[in-house]
Structures are given as C-alpha cells and as structure tokens.
Amino acid sequence: MQEQKLVKGQQISLSLVSWGRLGEAMGQWEETDVFVTGGIPGEKVVAEVVRVHRRYAAASVIEVLEASEWRVEPPCPYYGVCSGCQWQHVDYRRQLTVKQEKVADALHRVGDFIEPPVLPVRPSPIQYGYRNHARFTINRDGDLGFVNRQTRQFVRIDRCMLMHEGINGPLAELQGKCAETSQLSIRSGQETRDTLVQPTLINPEISLASGQKFYGDSIDGHAFRVSSPSFFQVNVEQTVQVVQVIREALEVKKTDVLLDAYTGVGTFAVLMAPYVGKVIAVEESSAAVADARLNTGEIPNIELVLGKTEDVLPNLTEKPDAAILDPPRAGCHPRTIESLIDLSPPKIAYVSCDAETLGRDLNLLCESAYTLEQVVPLDMFPQTHHVECVALLTRKSPAAPIILASASPRRRELLTGLGLVFQVVPSDIPEEPQPGEPPSKMAERLSLEKAQAVAARFQHGFVIAADSVV
C-alpha cells in the first residue's frame, strides 16, 4: 500500500504526544511527525496542515476533540495567527513545569548530563505587558505587524499583549503611517516611559518623535542609558530576580574580583558592584561600551574592557574570584571556555536564554575543571517557549598527587599496574642506623623521616615512603 502524502491545507485528526523544540505539540500522521501550534500533549485535535517538509509537517489546531486539563482561553485576539506567542492557551503553571522539563532535556541531550540539577522555574512577576522592545514588519500600506513563522503571512497588530503601554501607545499612533520603511523598532523604559523609535520617520502625518539614538530605562532603582543597537533585558522586573539568583549563587565578598563577560550596557556590573571589591566588565560592542561608560561612570570599582571576550580573557592579569557569563544565544566561543578554565575562578554563574548552547558549554566546562551545582530557570518570556537560565558551577578541587619519597622498583611497578600517576621526589635523609637500632625499626624510622621531609614541600598530596607508610 502506497504511503499517503500530506498536502498544504489538508485537515487531519491526530493525538498529540509530546512538546516540540519550538513550543508546538507533536503528533504523528501516517509515520510523519506533525508539529502542531495551539495544541497540548495529551489532546486529540483536528489540525490544518500549513507547511510540508520532506521529513515533517507543520499544522495548526482548528478543533479540539479532547481537551487537556491545562487548556485555557487565550486572551489575545491575534493568538494563533501572529505566532509571536506559543503558549497563551496553556495554563501558566503548566508553562513553568514544561520549561523546567525542556531545560533538563536539553542539558541531558546536548550536555550529556545524566540527571541535570534543574530547579523549578521562577515565575515572572507579570505574565503580560512585560516587554520593553518590539520590532515590527511593515507592509506596503504602512501597517505595523508581525509575520507568522509558519505561513509567512503578514498580520497587522494594533496592540500586543506582551508589550507594556510604552510600546502600545506609539504603535497606535504609528499604525498605517509607516510605508516609508519595511522594519520599525520601538523601545521604551517600563518605569521611565522614555521611548526610542527607529528609523527616523519623515511622514508629515506622524507627530511622534523618531530617530532617537538612545533611551533610558531603570532596573532596581539604577538608571541605564541604552543605545539603539545595544542589547538590554526585555523583562526588567524579572531581571531583578536574575541578579538575586546570581548573588545567591556566587556568594561574593566585598574583597572579591568579579569578571562580568558580555556585559552589554553594564547591567550586571552595575547591579553587582556594591557587593564586590572590583568588577572587570568585558564587551565587544562599541555602542554598548559607550552606554556602559555612562551607566558605570560614578561607580569607581568597575573596569570596562572593550573587546571580544575570547580575545580579552587570555590577557587578563588579574584572576577573578567569581565570573558571570551572559553570552548571546549562540553561546561562548571555544577560546572563552579555554581561557576561563585557565583563569579558574572558584565560581561561575552562566546566564543563558538557549538551553541547548548552555548544555554544550557546560559540558566543556565540566569535562575536567568544574562541577555543575544547579540550574535555576527563570521565566523571562511568559506565554512563549523561551526560558532564561542561571547555571552555577564550582571549580573542582585538584586531584591530590601521589608522591614517592622512596621509589623501589616493586613500588613503581605496583602503582603503574594500578594505572596511577605519581612523581618521585627523593629525600636527603641519610640511611644510617642509630646505635643498637634493629633493622626493622631502622626501616620504619627512615620511611617516616623521608615521608615527613618530602611532605613539607607540598601543600596537599599522598606521600609514600614504604609499602605500609603513607
């Protein structure tokens, strides 16, 4: 019997069994994996095929035949059409547990951790209206909106429920008036309501100011200037909790030197500076460093270094007591990992928005130098499948060396046969008997004296001076 082929527009019934990597629910139809937006594992649905690939298909729920207990009514009128959110139809409590499972799965699958120590996800203080940045596509009519990830169709958006009012206000004013450009970015401080609109708009119908080079925002009472090309956390309220997790993990002291790699506009450097002796903040973006110089200007214990992290770390002359890594989604350059292992800070807090690249980098760090103590996921992006993580690593204690203070051929052969690595350190103890000393007592005394003499040269290790003296 010839296998049936799916076609775009076809409606199919299927049972959903698991979550996909991008937040869809997955089922099978005639041995073809189908990734279904708007579904929940455990449900039976009717879905319409929107794209067909060689090995899988994408579909969208049009009818729920058997609903999950976790299904809720999405509040957004654009939900399911715009694709910016994936999980508005999923109870928020379930969103958090699924994100924990996804992080653990990625660390196991990519990082090769058997039972990764992933803690429960810390919820966001607000589940809607948290974003301070939006990038809109604009159609020929000047309408602002988003492009559906699967169908590639443009969807006009008059109000986004993930954005706070500092975004939605300008969106309403600009809607239908921006045909002069194809992309438009709006950024706005959640507390300051300071706004940046890029690019510059010349339509005389638009009264809203545009073309600003930067805007101001604040986190936990600290003001930050953010230039148009610079990265800044999109969920300011949850960022406060991220910093709290980092502080708890690193347990820094007022005398510590803290490395803040990929510092951006200096967010973590500014928020951690009061708790350490010095922060070395590294960033490759010249625009972000210019922002960071203003943001850290009155904080004397922050040293800013412009350059790629993988180029700066090998040349650091000061060894950090702790380190924060907050790389882009692609993760750390291999040379960054190598240099960090050489610098050997006792504790590292690795902040990541991609669990798979996090797993890859943690695997490299933990191969020989570090132990993964815990991973704290934080919900920086409610209603989506994305999740932020803070991983805590502690430096492994160096293996205690085996030192031979007396290396007979038999002793060498025995240790080598056991696969043990050792070094021979001869002592200067003269092998002379004391008056009236029996040979057995002489051997015992010399072994102890040799062991004590050699042990005085080392801070730690196992010193062997006889077959029975360690």
Where are these regions (language model features)?
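Conserved beta-loop-beta/alpha segment of the NTase-like Rossmann-fold superfamily
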Residues: 460-470
